[in-house]
Amino acid sequence: MVDNAADDGAHARTRESVPMITERLDGTRIAITGATGFLGTALVERFLRAVPGCELVLVVRAGKRTPARERVRREILRNDCFDRLRAELGDRFEAEMDRRIDVIEGDVSRDGLGLNDEGRAILKTCHTVVHSAAAVAFDSPLDSAVETNLLGPTRVAAAMREAGCTGHLIAVSTCYVAGARRGDAPEKVLPETPFATEADWRAEVAAARRLRSDTDAISRTVPKLAMFRKRARAELGGAGTPLLAAKTEKLREDWVRNELVEAGRARAASLGWPDAYAYTKALGERALLETRDGVPVTTVRPSIIESAMAEPRPGWIRGFRMAEPVIISYARGLLKEFPGIPEGVVDVIPVDMVVAAIIAVAAAGPDPSGPTVYQVASGARQPLRYREMVTTIREWFTEHPLYDKEGQPILVPEWSFPGRGRVEQQLRRATNLLKRGEKLIAALPVRGSQAEIVSDLEVLHIVIRHVICIPPKNHIAKCGAPFHGRQEFFRCDIFSA
């Protein structure tokens, strides 16, 4: 159990006389990776709305058929996160976004970010680079977690050097880098804490890449291909050759992914981390410190990021986070109980508080003394107990139930806080029942009952992964934000949550 309690004196630079954030960032250019994600979208919106004097450079991976700039337009600017800014700007919204946003095609899983000469020239003009791109799932395949979370920060720093960018790199990590260890985790770089690991990150990268290659090779052996084809035929019956081939290949790819997920979980546990996400983030911090080669670095470590408290509006969220699959499956009657210690702390932090802290760190600039760390979490100052969360959820869905297909309210049960094994068994039984039902109506088009079963199965698969990858309790930290300016925009005091 880790208590990520920040040192109260860690950031003595906070002064009332320091210029306000908006003034400090006026006229700056800020590059952001991971802008299409949950945190990245919120960060882009807040910079554009709250810091009118800044410009943004979004480093975005192009889709198979979608250029990077079009992805920004579709996936970021059309998100409901921007409803408030769109209303404020009215007819000027599109023109203002074109004026203030540059888009360069880049990918943190590639050396040099895959930037071309134009991209490097644009990156050179940036005063700050916020690296928020990450493989955030607790159960990411080992190789993808390594390429994105471990090597991503080092690639960003290297790309900055290659481009001649002398700006400040803000790397978003996680409070869980301390792993499943006991004791306070201070706001310090990992080598200066009791939680430093001796694992050789270069060896871990090489091993993960070998494992991907070896696992893929095994999946293509005659016995494995025969097994996948047999399963595909069992599911599809007398389907034609193209459908059978496509299903066989999907089963092969799924098998490879599952093997790499299990490998990531096992390797993380062997080194003292709860999952591949925390393990690769921790090694990513270490790799960045070793290879930054003069790039000024600040690390921001949030806990579990959840929906907004106030900005851009209360409750705003994008996609399934950690809590939503559990809450939804409970409300649907798919999950009768969930493992946990009643008095344990569920350390979640609203996304707008994380955004506020990152912007404040950007305004503060790098610490001349060297790499620094800011932890952004709620557990130390405003702890949410697991029992309290469960009670609140149950009371809400008792008063505002979901309804089944017959129009009847779904009654939610009492949670008894059982062990993880019992809940895993319950979830797998529910999954097996749904799979049997899916086979019985497999001839139906994907609508009606089959669509409902597919939806329920997707939720159950997510919840099962969460049960298996439950992070350690009581990962607690404080937000150390270096400015007081514009509190209405940059509030990050956990007591206000």
Roles of regions detected by a PLM:
Residues V2-A135, L142-E147, P153-T154, A159-H168, ...:
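N-terminal Rossmann/SDR dinucleotide-binding element
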Residues I76-R78, R182-D216, R313-L334, F338, ...:
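A catalytic-pocket lid/entrance helix-loop region that shapes and gates access to the active site
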Residues P141, P242, N258-D275, S303, ...:
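A conserved pocket-lining segment of Rossmann-fold NAD(P)-dependent short-chain dehydrogenase/reductase
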Residues L151-R155, L283-G284, P350:
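Conserved cofactor-binding/catalytic machinery of classical short-chain dehydrogenase/reductase
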Residues V222-E262, A269-A276, A282-G315, D367-V373:
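Conserved beta-loop-beta element that borders a ligand/cofactor-binding pocket
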Residues V361-P471, A477:
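Mid/C-terminal beta-alpha module of Rossmann-like enzyme folds, strongest
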Residues H466-S496:
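N-terminal low-complexity segments that are often proline-rich with Ser/Thr-Pro
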